[in-house]
Every structure is written in structure tokens, then in C-alpha cells.
């Protein structure tokens, strides 16, 4: 079986994206005998759905996990719910903007992850990795990706979710802005630990048919 790990390319004024670095670092690794496949998503609304759908259909992973950066957050934040809503004042990397359109015109207004995020937050904190539950993935590309990931994972009775991470310390230092950050090594360890925990507890969370 496979674990599919999505990260994002840089976007807007952020010239580096820790989610890309994490996905690349964990690509090809093995977690509980499952191979991790890291895939980098473009920050473009019109491209990510086909890419996510295609990869999940081809690989049929036991777990699909998206990660993205949330500038301003100081902790790793597993997301509970994705909403069927697109809103972006600044636009994506192709300049595309949305003002409240649905991601899926026929889809549910919101979809909960089937990953035990509450317990995951406790686990990360117990292992010295600052974490907090998030009830909003926003309305930009991360929420968009999360909605599609969970929707598609349900089709294959597999696990799907999303985790936000802070900016990485080395980049925050280079741009010389007083913004929360975390070391890249800590975030890589946190995501790896998250996948181990999710896979260990996978049977009780596979509830969709």
C-alpha cells in the first residue's frame, strides 16, 4: 500500500514553502511498511483537482495527507473540516480569483476528515511538537485541496486529511519579519509521526463505504 503526501509550491510573496520541503524530504521513505509518495501541487485552482483525483485513482493510497503552510500560525495544526467554498482576494499563482464559488457544485457544504485529529494533536504535544486543532482551513488552495482529498478518499474507503504547518525558521530569518516559525526538522518529524499514528489507528477510522 501507499501513503500519498501532497505539498504545495511557493505562492504569492512566499518564495519557499515548507510543505514542499516536507513532502520532498519524506518522499520515498517507508512508514509502517507503507511507501510514502510525495507530490507537489501547483497553487492553481484549475489544476489541483485533476491532479489530486488522478493520483488517488492511480495509487489508491491507504492514506492521503495534504500539508500546507499557514503563515502566522506558530504550531502544527491538523484540520478538522473542509468547506465547499472558494474565496481569494489575492488570486492564485495564475492570477485566478474567486468570490464565494463552490469547489464542487453537487458536493456537501462541509466534509469532516476521518483522521483522528483530536488525538493526533495530543500525540504531537506529548512528543514535544507544538500542535493545536484547527477548525478552519481557510478558503484558499489548502481548503480546496483538503475538500477534494477527503471527497476522493471516501470513494476508496481510505483515509484523507490535511495539516497546516508554520513557516520554517530559516526562511523566516532570511525575510527578516517578526512572524511565527518552526524548524523544518521539527515539522518533518511531526508529519512523519502523524502518519505513523494515523496508520496505526487506521482500522477504527475507516468508516466510509
Swiss-Prot record:
Subcellular compartments: Cytoplasm
PROSITE patterns, per the entry: PYRASE_CYS, PYRASE_GLU
Main location (coarse class): cytoplasm
Active site: 79, 142, 164
Record keywords, A-Z: Cytoplasm, Hydrolase, Protease, Thiol protease
Catalytic activity, EC: 3.4.19.3
Catalytic activity, reaction form: Release of an N-terminal pyroglutamyl group from a polypeptide, the second amino acid generally not being Pro
One record GO biological process: proteolysis
Subunit and partners: Homotetramer.
Function: Removes 5-oxoproline from various penultimate amino acid residues except L-proline.
Annotated NCBIfam families: PRK13193.1
PANTHER family: PROTEASE FAMILY C15 PYROGLUTAMYL-PEPTIDASE I-RELATED, PYROGLUTAMYL-PEPTIDASE I
Official protein name in the record: Pyrrolidone-carboxylate peptidase
Species lineage: Archaea, Thermoproteota, Thermoprotei, Sulfolobales, Sulfolobaceae
Amino acid at each position: 500500500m501507499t501513503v500519498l503526501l501532497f505539498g504545495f509550491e511557493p505562492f504569492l510573496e512566499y518564495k519557499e514553502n515548507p510543505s514542499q520541503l516536507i513532502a520532498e524530504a519524506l518522499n520515498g521513505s517507508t512508514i509502517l511498511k507503507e511507501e510514502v509518495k510525495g507530490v507537489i501541487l501547483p497553487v492553481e485552482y484549475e489544476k489541483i483537482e485533476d491532479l489530486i483525483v488522478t493520483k488517488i485513482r492511480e495509487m489508491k493510497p491507504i492514506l492521503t495527507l495534504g500539508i500546507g503552510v499557514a503563515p502566522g500560525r506558530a504550531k502544527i495544526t491538523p484540520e478538522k473540516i473542509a468547506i465547499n467554498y472558494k474565496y481569494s482576494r489575492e488570486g492564485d499563482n495564475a492570477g485566478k480569483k474567486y468570490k464565494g464559488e463552490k469547489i464542487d457544485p453537487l458536493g456537501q457544504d462541509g466534509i469532516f476528515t476521518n483522521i483522528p485529529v483530536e488525538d493526533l494533536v495530543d500525540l504531537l504535544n506529548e512528543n514535544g511538537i507544538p500542535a493545536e486543532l484547527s477548525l478552519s482551513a481557510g478558503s484558499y488552495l489548502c481548503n480546496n485541496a483538503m475538500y477534494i482529498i477527503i471527497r476522493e478518499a471516501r470513494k476508496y474507503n481510505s483515509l484523507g486529511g490535511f495539516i497546516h504547518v508554520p513557516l520554517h525558521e530559516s526562511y523566516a530569518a532570511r525575510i527578516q519579519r517578526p512572524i511565527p516559525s518552526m524548524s523544518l526538522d521539527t515539522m518533518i518529524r511531526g508529519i512523519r509521526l502523524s502518519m505513523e499514528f494515523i496508520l496505526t489507528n487506521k482500522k477504527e477510522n475507516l468508516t466510509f463505504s
